[in-house]
Amino acid sequence: MLIRVGYDIRFETDRPTPMLALLSLHPSRHHDLRTPHRIVASPDIPMFEYADSFGNVVSRFTLPPGGLDLSCDFVVEDSGEPDPVVSDAAQHAVEDLPEDVLVYLLASRY
């Protein structure tokens, strides 16, 4: 199935404000894009991208005083099937989890 994805977001500020935004399709799904994926900023500002430790695309920019509009509109193809569920997966108490998975339980700084 084809899914149209998009957003229009407005930010308002009275001073320059550095910002990180995770508003992009995950790179693992780029092969499913049927139209270009491009974030449009108005007014036009420099925007830089990097990949975080999970492979997500992070947009880095500074909001100008006054306001900024971000928009994106694209089409992605998807099977429509739900993610697989492991019906016999065990539930573990937090205190029994291995240390290497605790990072996924930490709160975001934002």
Language model feature labels by segment:
Residues M1-E81:
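Intrinsically disordered, low-complexity N-terminal segments that are enriched in acidic
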Residues D69-Y110:
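Acidic low-complexity segments
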